[in-house]
Structure formats: structure tokens, C-alpha cells
UniProtKB/Swiss-Prot annotation:
This is DNA-binding protein inhibitor ID-1. A motif (Nuclear export signal) lies at residues 91-104. GO terms for biological process: apoptotic process; BMP signaling pathway; cell-abiotic substrate adhesion; cellular response to dopamine; cellular response to epidermal growth factor stimulus; cellular response to nerve growth factor stimulus; cellular response to peptide; cellular response to transforming growth factor beta stimulus. Phosphorylated in vitro by PKA and PKC. The gene is Id1. Its main location: cytoplasm. It comes from Rattus norvegicus (Rat).
Length: 164
């Protein structure tokens, strides 16, 4: 990684959103000092704020993130090496595809009679579960009664099963 020398000190211009309206030592809320230092427009100050080991740790973390993205995004080609830019492009496309799919599912669900919603409402599921539980309960009660009657008749079939 090439880093500009600290002798070429350049100051951030007014287009730098992190530095605009802030004093040099002020920390931006929500970001660590290290993140702010990396994000500043004056990249020439980077070597003074981070030592080489810290830069290597950050690069290692980023490479791990790219590897994880390669695992998660199914549209990435697995048979060849892809650049970081290509990984990011596939990630953006994949997120956009997921958003479109989510929006189309919600449109189908709100359209009324045009199609069934992809997910059944919880009340419907609860009703189905209750019906199944009642069916299982009545079936198991039936077998318990059958077993009791079988024992009561001395091991033989109850009269209504004997065909008489």
C-alpha cells in the first residue's frame, strides 16, 4: 500500500464533509478517532496517526470482509478470481435484486385478489395448528379408549370390531 509522505501536507478543502465546520481536534460523534483519521480528506496525515501495524490490521479486516461477501453473494463467479470492485458491484446488484423481490412480494400481498400472499398470516397458522392439535388429540383419545376396552375384554377385540 502506498501512502503519501507527511512532508506533502495538504489541508482539506471545503468539500470535505468530515472537516467542514469542525476544529482539528474535534471528534465526530458515532465514529472512532481511528475511523475519523482514516476518513479525513487530508490523506497525507495518515502515516502520522496510524503506525504500520494498525494499517495492516485494518487491511486484514477489510480482506476478511471481502471474503465474507464473496461467500454470501450467490451471483459472484466461483471459478475465477474477482476484484474488490467487482465484488462490490455484485453486492450492490444483489441487494437491489433483493429489494425488488421484497417490493414485488409486498405488492402481491396488498393487491387483494390477484394472488395469495407469500406468507400466511399468523392467525391463519394458529387456526391450522389448533385444528391439527384437536385432530391428534381426538385420535389419541380414540386409541386410549380402544386399548382400555381391549384390556377390559380380556385381550380380545371389542364387540364392535369382531364383526358381530
Amino acid at each position: 500500500m502506498k501512502v503519501a509522505s507527511s512532508s506533502a501536507a495538504a489541508t482539506a478543502g471545503p468539500s470535505c464533509s468530515l472537516k467542514a465546520g469542525r476544529t482539528a481536534g474535534e471528534v465526530v460523534l458515532g465514529l472512532s478517532e481511528q475511523s475519523v483519521a482514516i476518513s479525513r480528506c487530508a490523506g497525507t496525515r495518515l502515516p502520522a496517526l496510524l503506525d504500520e501495524q494498525q494499517v495492516n490490521v485494518l487491511l486484514y479486516d477489510m480482506n476478511g470482509c471481502y471474503s465474507r461477501l464473496k461467500e454470501l453473494v450467490p451471483t459472484l463467479p466461483q471459478n475465477r478470481k474477482v476484484s474488490k470492485v467487482e465484488i462490490l458491484q455484485h453486492v450492490i446488484d444483489y441487494i437491489r435484486d433483493l429489494q425488488l423481490e421484497l417490493n414485488s412480494e409486498s405488492e402481491v400481498a396488498t393487491a387483494g385478489g390477484r394472488g395469495l400472499p407469500v406468507r400466511a398470516p399468523l392467525s391463519t397458522l394458529n387456526g391450522e395448528i389448533s385444528a391439527l392439535a384437536a385432530e391428534v388429540r381426538s385420535e389419541s383419545e380414540y386409541y386410549i379408549i380402544l386399548l382400555w376396552e381391549t384390556k377390559a375384554t380380556g385381550g380380545g377385540c371389542p364387540p364392535y370390531f369382531s364383526g358381530a
